[in-house]
C-alpha cells in the first residue's frame, strides 16, 4: 500500500519497508531529520548528503514530523511517533 502523507513524503510498503521516504527516492525522512538535529543546515543536507532533494522537500519533511509528534492521522493510517 502507498500513502502520500505530504507533497513530497510517502509511505510505501514496496520501498524501505514502508518507512517514510521522499517521493521518487529511497531517502528516509528520518535520516534527513537526524542530520538536521545534529546541527546541519538544510543547505548542507541537500548539498553534501542528498542532492536529489531540495529545500522545499526537506521543509515538507519537517512539517510532517511535527504532525507525527502531534499524533496526526492520515486517512485510514494512523501515524504515531
Regions found by a protein language model. Name each.
Residues 28-81:
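Long, charge-rich, low-complexity alpha-helical segments
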Residues 4-44:
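A short, structured beta-strand/loop element
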Residues 2-4, 8, 73, 81:
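Aromatic-anchored, charged helix-turn/loop surface patch used as a conserved interaction hotspot
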Amino acid at each position: 500500500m502507498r500513502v502520500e502523507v505530504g507533497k513530497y513524503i510517502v509511505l510505501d510498503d514496496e520501498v524501505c519497508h514502508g518507512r517514510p521516504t521522499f517521493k521518487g527516492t529511497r531517502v528516509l525522512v528520518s535520516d534527513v531529520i537526524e542530520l538536521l538535529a545534529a546541527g546541519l543546515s538544510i543547505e548542507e543536507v541537500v548539498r553534501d548528503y542528498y542532492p536529489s532533494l531540495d529545500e522545499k522537500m526537506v521543509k515538507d519533511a519537517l512539517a510532517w514530523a511535527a504532525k507525527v509528534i502531534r499524533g496526526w492521522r492520515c486517512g485510514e493510517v494512523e501515524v504515531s511517533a
